[in-house]
Amino acid sequence: MDIKLISKKKNIEERKQLLSELHASKSVIVEKDEELVCPMCDSKNIIKDYEKAEIVCEDCGCVLQDNLFDVGPEWRAFDHEQRVKRSRVGAPMTYTIHDKGLSTVIDWRNKDSYGKDISADKRAQLYRLRKWQRRIRVSDASERNLAFALSELDRIASKLGLPRNVRENAAVLYRGAVEKGLIRGRSIEGVAAAALYAACRRCKVPRTLDEIAEMSRVDRKEIGRTYRFISRELKIRLAPTSPIDYVPRFASELKLPGEVESKAISILQKAGDKGLTSGRGPTGVAAAAIYIASVLHGTRKTQREVADVAGVTEVTIRNRYKELTEHLDIDVTL
């Protein structure tokens, strides 16, 4: 199938004519600067609908392509067990394992390829082979340190319930620090915790330094110092954490309805426009906005409950509450 590129057109009629010609030839792929762009409204909100085999603009509804190929497997699976059994490839490459997941391991089950039990003498041989394989997977001290650091990263991330993309990001940052020799003179646990904190901020999955310090074996001050150092050396550009980023998590832990969450975000957006969030701890401002929104909605939570979830004091919530209600003219009846 020929692929034609549609450049940006000033005349809307010219665009329509070109689009109709391409639809007739069944070769519509709209692209600009390596990104899919709608030729009708210049939107980049393009949806690939594999069920209908279409590429559609989310904003104006223009169908850019109606014969999209499905590049997935030819087999179907209805549960995880079937998916594992029918898959003909191994696990994807990952930065969270020291060898990037490219090595293989001897299965712990003492069964052959037909599912039959292995004899006792073969079982002893397999035990020795497994032991030696574990040893040779880590060839030198640097690999051993990397394996330990990545396991520490995974341990902290598991305790904090962080998603896969944050773990991958943290592993990439830690590997970058190793390549630049930033680990020398610093604890492996400290650099791992700092990389995880940076990854959380980069992926918009906010966690405070206190939360990470609580789950790691390093104190808050060392994590903060190491984070600033590796951010400077690796040239990581991170915007300040917004209080809005904390609202979904706090609201979920408090079991508040979606209306309260939306109202809290609206309050914080207005507060940001008036400069009320700058220079203040994002968790405290987010907690105060959630408290105000819960009172306005009628699903009231106590200041103590909100403070415990946000990890701040009741005094902080009261101070931020007073600032928000006064400057935003919010009438709250307690």
Curated annotation (Swiss-Prot):
SUPFAM superfamilies: Cyclin-like, Zinc beta-ribbon
Sequence repeat start-end pairs: 151-234, 245-326
One Gene Ontology MF term: zinc ion binding
InterPro entries: Cyclin-like_dom (IPR013763), Cyclin-like_sf (IPR036915), TFIIB (IPR000812), TFIIB_arc (IPR023484), TFIIB_CS (IPR023486), TFIIB_cyclin (IPR013150), Znf_TFIIB (IPR013137)
PROSITE patterns in the record: TFIIB (PS00782), ZF_TFIIB (PS51134)
UniProt key word Magnesium: no
GO terms classed as biological process: transcription preinitiation complex assembly
TFIIB-type zinc-finger residues: 34-65
Any one GO cellular component localisation term in the record: transcription preinitiation complex
Binding site for Zn(2+): 38, 41, 57, 60
Keywords: Metal-binding, Repeat, Transcription, Transcription regulation, Zinc, Zinc-finger
UniProt xrefs under Pfam families: TFIIB, Zn_Ribbon_TF
Alphabetized CDD domains for the sequence: CYCLIN_TFIIB_archaea_like_rpt1, CYCLIN_TFIIB_archaea_like_rpt2
Gene3D superfamilies in alphabetical order: 1.10.472.170, Cyclin-like
Recorded family membership: Belongs to the TFIIB family.
Database matches in NCBIfam families: PRK00423.1 (NF001658)
Functional summary from the UniProt entry: Stabilizes TBP binding to an archaeal box-A promoter. Also responsible for recruiting RNA polymerase II to the pre-initiation complex (DNA-TBP-TFIIB).
PANTHER family according to UniProt: TRANSCRIPTION INITIATION FACTOR IIB, TRANSCRIPTION INITIATION FACTOR IIB-RELATED
Record's protein name: Transcription initiation factor IIB
Organism: Methanococcus aeolicus (strain ATCC BAA-1280 / DSM 17508 / OCM 812 / Nankai-3)
Organism classification: Archaea, Methanobacteriati, Methanobacteriota, Methanomada group, Methanococci
